[in-house]
């Protein structure tokens, strides 16, 4: 596996370095489009990479809608010319005015906010009415069982009714993220997803009947969106205009954590970290220049898959170092100072945010360097 991540010219790259593989990114994009039955059905999240080049690559494949976690990400996507952007994070404090200013700055892009709090949505509506916008489109954030954000299913219909009376906002649909759908077995994951979908569909029918503009449904994450791929609303007059979109994020770059946890997903990690041995502090021991300032420190457990070294085990990791010990009997095969290796991050999303730019490789050669555009919390607005 490690041979596919090696490339010419790596000796000149400062380590640790995050490397993206353009051919693998394209392959993952194509697989996601196939699963969604076409690019027009995808509304992908950009938080895993935060890179404008990948937005433009996605648009080359026909993807026109994107989901963001920060206003900086939304600005990056809008700057690429995306047609529809949902800021999938509750707006509180100064972020309400920031969202309004961003929407004003990009009039050709259709922005959506999400919300699960009537007071917050009222504040958003007031801000919209005081601006040149006059109105903001809103998706109700639905608690699909994760209990992180969102309106519980039992309160969804009444909440939407209340939203409809708020001046300055227009109810446009539902944001249905189920990040807790992490069952290892696809059939278990599918069964759990289907169970919630069966609860959601009649609620959506009622909401669409009462509020015809509420026609968008953005559903699923990377592990679950294949389970929702048959979430088709053709069983009634009320939902005939409903549009369903699937919202993976990690699948485009992918990582070791997902590849280990979800063997049914067909994606290949398209990012790796170039690292080097910096010390042999004892027989059979080696330290890499890859601490938790260079690879995400979550989740608990192994923080990445070290390629090209067998029969070794992790000792500990600190800010700038990652130390391993060879297993008994393999001490003589211990990597030497200066040797290069590649690590597939367990969690690519926070790892990407640790680097100002990524080296881009295709067909074993360096072809570009991409800025991690939305790494910071603020760009302009």
Can you say where each PLM-predicted feature lies in the sequence?
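Generic N-terminal amphipathic, Lys/Arg-enriched alpha-helix
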Residues: 2-20
């Amino acid at each position: 596996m490690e041979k596919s991540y090696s490339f010419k010219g790596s000796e000149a790259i400062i380590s640790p370095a995050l490397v993206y593989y353009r051919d693998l990114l394209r392959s993952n994009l194509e697989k996601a489009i196939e699963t969604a039955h076409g690019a027009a059905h995808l509304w992908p999240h950009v938080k895993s990479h935060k890179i404008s080049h990948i937005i433009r690559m996605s648009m080359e494949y026909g993807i026109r809608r994107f989901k963001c976690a920060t206003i900086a990400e939304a600005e990056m996507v809008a700057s690429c010319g995306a047609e529809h952007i949902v800021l999938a994070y509750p707006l509180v404090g100064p972020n309400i005015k920031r969202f309004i200013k961003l929407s004003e700055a990009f009039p050709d892009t259709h922005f959506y906010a999400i919300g699960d709090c009537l007071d917050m949505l009222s504040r958003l509506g007031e801000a919209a009415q005081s601006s040149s916008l006059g109105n903001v489109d809103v998706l109700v954030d639905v608690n699909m069982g994760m209990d992180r954000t969102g309106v519980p299913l039992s309160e969804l219909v009444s909440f939407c009714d209340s939203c409809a009376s708020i001046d300055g906002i227009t109810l446009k649909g539902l944001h249905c993220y189920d990040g807790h759908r992490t069952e290892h077995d696809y059939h278990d994951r599918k069964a759990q997803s289907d169970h919630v979908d069966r609860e959601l569909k009649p609620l959506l029918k009622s909401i669409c009947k009462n509020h015809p503009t509420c026609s968008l449904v953005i559903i699923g994450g990377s592990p679950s969106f294949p389970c929702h791929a048959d979430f088709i609303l053709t069983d009634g007059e009320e939902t005939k205009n409903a549009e369903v979109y699937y919202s993976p994020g990690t699948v485009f770059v992918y990582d070791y954590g997902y590849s280990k946890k979800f063997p049914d997903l067909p994606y290949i990690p398209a990012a790796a970290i170039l690292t080097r041995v910096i010390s042999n502090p004892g027989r059979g021991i080696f330290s890499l220049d890859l601490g938790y300032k260079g690879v995400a420190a979550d989740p608990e457990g192994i923080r990445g898959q070290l390629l090209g070294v067998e029969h070794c085990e992790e000792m500990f990791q600190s800010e700038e170092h990652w130390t391993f010990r060879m297993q008994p009997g393999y001490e003589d095969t211990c990597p030497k100072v200066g040797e290069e290796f590649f690590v597939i991050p367990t969690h690519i999303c926070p790892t990407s945010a640790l680097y100002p730019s990524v080296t881009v490789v295709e067909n074993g050669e360096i072809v570009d360097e991409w800025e991690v555009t939305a790494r910071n919390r603020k760009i302009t607005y």
